[in-house]
Design a protein with these regions (language model features):
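Amphipathic alpha-helical interface elements
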Residues: 1-159
Length: 159
C-alpha cells in the first residue's frame, strides 16, 4: 500500500514533468538555442531549475490558468510539508483534508462515515471497516482530481 507521502510525491513528480513540457514548448526549438540558452536556464543552478519558478513563468505567460497554478502550488506545498514532518499522515487526517479540499480540481470530498446506531451496538470491526472505506473514497477522489489536473496540463500548448 502506498503512503500518503509517497502518493503526493509521485503526483508532484508527474506535475513537474507536465510543467517541464510546457516550459520547453515556450522556448525556441533550434539546437543552438536549446543547448546554449535553454538547458542552462533549466538545469542545476539555473534560474528555472526550481519547479515553483517554472510554474510561475508558465502562469505569467498565460499558458495555465490561475486555478491550475494554485492547485500545483498547493500540492507542492503539501509535498514539502509531508517531507519535513516526522508524523505519518493518512488521507483522512485533518492536516491533509484541509489542503486537498482547497484544490480547484477536487470535486466535493465524500462525507465522513456516520454510524446511525447506538454506541454500544457499534463494534470496533465495523468502525475500522468504515474508516478504511472512507480512506479509500478520499484517496480515489484525490486520484481523479490529480489525474484531471495532469491531463489538462499535458494537453495544453504553450503558444
Amino acid at each position: 500500500r502506498q503512503t500518503l507521502s509517497g502518493f503526493i510525491q509521485t503526483a508532484v513528480l508527474l506535475l513537474a514533468e507536465a510543467v517541464d513540457q510546457l516550459i520547453l514548448q515556450a522556448f525556441r526549438k533550434d539546437d543552438y538555442a536549446v543547448k546554449y540558452a535553454v538547458e542552462p536556464l533549466l538545469e542545476g543552478s539555473g534560474p528555472l531549475a526550481n519547479l515553483s519558478v517554472r510554474l510561475k513563468l508558465i502562469y505569467a505567460l498565460g499558458v495555465i490558468s490561475r486555478d491550475e497554478y494554485e492547485d500545483v502550488e498547493l500540492l507542492v506545498a503539501l509535498n514539502n510539508e509531508l517531507e519535513q514532518e516526522k508524523t505519518v499522515y493518512s488521507f483522512t487526517d485533518d492536516e491533509v483534508l484541509g489542503p486537498i479540499s482547497m484544490l480547484h480540481s477536487m470535486t466535493a470530498l465524500p462525507p465522513p462515515p456516520t454510524l446511525h446506531m447506538p454506541e454500544d451496538v457499534v463494534d470496533d470491526a465495523l468502525r475500522t471497516m468504515q474508516e478504511q472505506r472512507y480512506q479509500q473514497m478520499v484517496r480515489s477522489a484525490l486520484v481523479l482530481s490529480i489525474t484531471d489536473l495532469i491531463t489538462r496540463l499535458e494537453n495544453k500548448k504553450a503558444f
